[in-house]
Design a protein with these regions (language model features):
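Mixed-charge (Asp/Glu-Lys/Arg
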Residues: 1-37, 42-167
Length: 167
């Protein structure tokens, strides 16, 4: 029996779905298969004169949050993007969802939301353990983050990557 989880298959599939969407938009998209730190997909224009890096994270449409991890708090620069991919369960009738977020926007929102979470009391009034907590999540639309930030403006915002590699 295969020990891989449904989440593992979904993560692998997401990289191919994102690469396919980028190729449909006449970009070159190469999946790194884990061979490039912080980069799931390397993207270039057809002339290979401009590049950007894409980190892919997955969720199931209808879920409340997507997990992005601590590295989402780091601004990797203007040529780095996060693509959050909602891959529906087969036969669920739900659509795929894509949110294309520049690293600067992601870093600012995740860090601020985590600071707000850490400074608020827990469910039983206790102080939260911000030092040892490595979890970082984002609320999926229609929900917003504690700081009011929403992923909605990033829905299907493929133009952000297209513009980053434009000549």
């Amino acid at each position: 029996m295969d020990a891989r989880t449904d989440k593992g298959y979904r993560g692998d599939a997401a990289q191919f779905f994102v690469a396919g969407e980028l190729c449909r938009r006449q970009l070159v998209a190469v999946i790194t298969l884990g061979n490039c730190p912080n980069t799931d997909i390397l993207v270039s224009n057809a002339a290979a004169s401009r590049f950007c890096h894409v980190q892919v994270k997955t969720f199931v449409p209808g879920n409340r949050t997507v997990s992005v991890g601590m590295k989402a708090e780091k601004d990797f620069g203007p040529t780095f993007f996060w693509v959050l991919v909602g891959i529906p369960i087969p036969d669920s009738g739900k659509d795929f969802e894509f949110f294309i977020v520049p690293a600067a926007d992601m870093a600012r929102a995740v860090a601020e939301s985590f600071r707000l979470w850490a400074s608020s009391p827990g469910a039983k009034g206790q102080q939260r353990d911000a030092v040892n907590n490595k979890v970082r999540t984002l609320s999926l639309p229609p929900r917003t983050e504690t700081n009011g930030w929403s992923l909605e403006p990033y829905r299907n915002a493929w133009h952000r990557i297209i513009n980053a590699v434009a000549t």
